Design a protein with these regions (language model features):
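Active-site HxH/HxHxD metal-binding segment of metal-dependent hydrolases
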Residues: 1-58
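Histidine-centered divalent metal-coordination motifs
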Residues: 3-9, 68, 130, 193
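Aromatic/hydrophobic pocket-lining residues that form the small-molecule binding cavity
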Residues: 10, 107, 111, 190
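Residue-level signal for inorganic ion chemistry
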Residues: 16, 130, 155, 197
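Short, leucine-enriched amphipathic alpha-helices that occur as contiguous helical runs
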Residues: 22, 148, 152-156, 187
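Short, solvent-exposed loop/turn segments at secondary-structure boundaries
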Residues: 36-40, 96-99, 139-140, 182-184
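Metallo-beta-lactamase
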Residues: 59-154
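C-terminal regulatory/interaction regions
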Residues: 157-205
Length: 205
């Protein structure tokens, strides 16, 4: 099962399928565009709202969770109240909104959807694509949302103070203390924030 089309999730899919004989399920028919091995076709397309029963295994239900990427999705094991959330939420800290494919408005809406699923009692545990399971999902959702809004406010303040409207300048002004090796990923999120602010301004006119 592939939750989204990023190389750290798709790179070994074909080899694993060949060795195990297992089919590949994914959110797009063709995946792996950013891997050195090139693209590959999935065996089955994961579509929102569909139930995927397997003999002797739990039933999976699919939810679209765009934002980190446009194709991100969650895989819910209803009976276990457990959801694989890909890179949408982590226990150890925030994820990246990968502009231009990722979108901050979509990401915040996906957090709202996850919060609703938890409040409805459909999910008790998140299993992210990196790190440990999240056994207190509401806390992680709210911490993640608060972080994104705080960063957005910091970008607004930096722009108001005269910082140049480009991602590199804003990184230097806002992301003080963030390790330099995270610059590239942070720049993607900053660009997504700028798009969000432009949209917010347009809607306010």
């Amino acid at each position: 099962f592939l939750t989204h089309d990023h190389h750290d999730h798709t790179a070994g899919a074909v080899e694993l399928a060949q060795r195990s004989g297992a089919p590949i399920y994914g959110p797009k028919l063709e995946m792996g565009a950013d891997t050195s091995g090139g693209t590959f076709k999935v065996d089955y397309l994961l579509e929102e709202g569909l139930l995927y029963p397997f003999e002797g295994a739990p039933i999976f239900e699919i939810y679209k969770l765009p934002g980190h990427s446009s194709d991100s999705l969650g895989i819910l094991l209803s009976e276990e109240q457990l959801m694989f959330v890909g890179d949408v939420v982590f226990r150890h800290g925030p994820t990246v909104v990968f502009h231009p494919d990722g979108n901050l408005a979509d990401y915040l809406a996906s957090l709202d959807l996850l919060e609703d699923l938890v409040n409805l009692g459909k999910v008790n545990v998140f299993c992210p694509g990196h790190g440990h399971p999240i056994v207190d999902p509401l806390r992680s959702i709210r911490a993640t949302r608060n972080h994104r809004i705080e960063r957005l406010d910091q970008v607004k303040q930096a722009l108001a103070a005269g910082v140049s409207r480009d991602a590199d300048s804003l990184f230097d002004a806002v992301y003080e203390g963030v390790d330099e090796h995270l610059r590239w990923a942070s720049l993607r999120s900053i660009e997504a924030q700028l798009v969000y602010l432009d949209s917010e301004q347009s809607e306010g006119l």
